[in-house]
């Protein structure tokens, strides 16, 4: 097909017809219709134009190498033996490669050019080698000439020294001959000389030294070591040449000892080991341990020290401590928060506090129009709850706290996050211990008090008595010139409720509570629990900013994205503003009640801060373990005698677990102690049971139950499991169990006293004391004491008791009897025999 139309070519190359016509016009081909024909020459012209426009070579690339593969098949008949033939298929493969002549010529030209370059490079290299060789020869000649000149100078110096030595020897020889002539004896005889044989010298280290020593020992042919010199005076004329000594090289690593102690600036983190502290002060670890022992702390080289202890040690050793703050990430988080200038009023956070059973929850129920008190176990509040109430005059956020003594930490947390504290006091009961404690918490938090005198509908109500008792604790009503509002209310009839709300709103208006409603949210964890279906659930009171669904939340060491937010009524919301209590789903675990919750920009940053807090918490925990301290050594030695009751506590919420753990730990005494192995939130699972098995502990479930797998394991291992819903019952039963593990106590009671009037001898029993019972009664087989002059001389057992040769079990006062004491024969007249019995006494804590 030599000619094709424009449309056909566009279909083949896959381009629009209009685009192809435009490219043909740009290439100089006069075609402007879709059905116009295009020749092969026009196709090549278009291809050259496109190559040129794309930056490629205009020449059409042609293959430089062609490879042809050819296969042929045939069959041959092969004799298979036995008159049979076999057909074999034969395949012949042929491969031929044809190379374009121009490509071969190009390769030859490239090879020739490369060969010429190599030859030129070899010539240059040979020239450089020749020049280097000539330079080396000239240098060798110069060095040879210098050596020859040195050798000649040395020979001349040697000849001069030899001539001087020869002249010196001749002069000494003449002097020697003259002296010999003067000292020669008259008879002409010379006494024979005796020489000691020379001792063998040590082998020289070098051969040259060996040769020199041999030459010196050979001497002259006459056997003398020097010419014309007597052997005894051979060394007198020699003088050693003066040789200048080389100065000793200075020590490379030499240093001068400091004349005064060096004072270091020691940076101290929050926790560090003894070895790290010693390294920073440039001293040995033993010095630091010695300083710690002076402070009364037994430490090892790997002991973790807290910042305060390390600071004292550094100061004691004469250095300057510098405390390091490791909360850089925390400070960056605070600085990264958006500062919003617009401030808005928020609802007042009101905490209801008071003694147990004074009607706090009932009062809040009437305000909320709900029935929470009826659902509380035992009729007492054991959880901290947060509720938001809307009235005609404004919104109020209420926090209900438990009144029982075990929930002190809960009340303290409630007072910290509050603006106003409502102190509920029963009009018929007055101020009680938890009432006074609530006053102290409110003062510590700096929150104003509003006293609600409850139960005024009772006939024995006495509001004036309440005012008088509270005045003793510096809570004075406005009627008496104080600054505290007193409102008489009744949670049963609703009397005074409106006055109480009005008093709260008035107090909030005076305080002018304003915060920023924009920017990242910040709040505090009121309570947390582990829900079986939803996972960790935390009740958070938003204090500033706006918390939205999907935010990254950081609380203590737990992080997570807010998956859902629920109100106290179970309604799901998208966002929560200031003073709004919400339940949060999505955290990685249950945070501790009282932890601060803050929104972080990204998840990576949140995990980094949480990891840093977790490591810091672990280091602080290790630092607090003072197992090696001197004051704990004796306690550890005595622990073998102290009975311990191990407990594994699981509760529905974090606050209850904390309160129960603290209350049970306080039951410990010198005789028995309660050790909480673990306290957590959520149902009882297999992990808790295995922990109880390993530590021999009792499992306590507070408003939680064990799952099926845990129940099977409990039945298999025989673990003691107790369920409680009221904290009173848990404390009472654990107290009883603590008494049960103590050893029983025995008290000795004297039941009789007998006086020995005579002593008889019995062949069977030995000494028999004839006694008169003067007090009580004497019983057989009871333990006795023998008293002599009111001093105990023997303790033993009463073996026989007779009256007129008859064995009796008991002899009363005023009756005579015979008493045989077991294993004691030294009874004397006038002794007293005291009979007593051991009475078991129930132990007490």
UniProtKB/Swiss-Prot annotation:
It comes from Nitrosococcus oceani (strain ATCC 19707 / BCRC 17464 / JCM 30415 / NCIMB 11848 / C-107). This is Translation initiation factor IF-2. Residues 490-492 are annotated as: G5. One of the essential components for the initiation of protein synthesis. Protects formylmethionyl-tRNA from spontaneous hydrolysis and promotes its binding to the 30S ribosomal subunits. Also involved in the hydrolysis of GTP during the formation of the 70S ribosomal complex. Keywords: Cytoplasm, GTP-binding, Initiation factor, Nucleotide-binding, Protein biosynthesis. One of its GO terms (cellular component) is cytosol. PROSITE patterns: G_TR_2, IF2. Its main location: cytoplasm.
